[in-house]
Amino acid sequence: MSVLTPLLLRGLTGSARRLPVPRAKIHSLPPDEKLGIMELAVGLTSCFVTFLLPAGWILSHLETYRRPE
């Protein structure tokens, strides 16, 4: 590592430190009613089917996707 590296990095990040960072104004209230068991089951099942099932299918069939050498 060169002796100049810290100086170069400080020169690159120096101008970024002076920029104003906007703050998000997010306000939320507690839910009006709690979720029931059925809503939770439907939500978790749909997430599983949407994301994990296709990924598992692709990983289990990975050999068929490989290019022949």
Curated annotation (Swiss-Prot):
Principal location: mitochondrion
Pfam families, A to Z: COX8
Stored InterPro entries: Cyt_c_oxidase_su8 (IPR003205), Cyt_c_oxidase_su8_sf (IPR036548)
Keywords of this entry: Membrane, Mitochondrion, Mitochondrion inner membrane, Transit peptide, Transmembrane, Transmembrane helix, Ubl conjugation
The UniProt record lists the keyword Ubl conjugation: yes
Membrane topology value: Single-pass membrane protein
Chain ranges on the Mitochondrial intermembrane side, renumbered to this chain: 61-69
Protein task: Component of the cytochrome c oxidase, the last enzyme in the mitochondrial electron transport chain which drives oxidative phosphorylation. The respiratory chain contains 3 multisubunit complexes succinate dehydrogenase (complex II, CII), ubiquinol-cytochrome c oxidoreductase (cytochrome b-c1 complex, complex III, CIII) and cytochrome c oxidase (complex IV, CIV), that cooperate to transfer electrons derived from NADH and succinate to molecular oxygen, creating an electrochemical gradient over the inner membrane that drives transmembrane transport and the ATP synthase.
Family: Belongs to the cytochrome c oxidase VIII family.
Protein name: Cytochrome c oxidase subunit 8A, mitochondrial
Organism placement in taxonomy: Eukaryota, Metazoa, Chordata, Craniata, Vertebrata
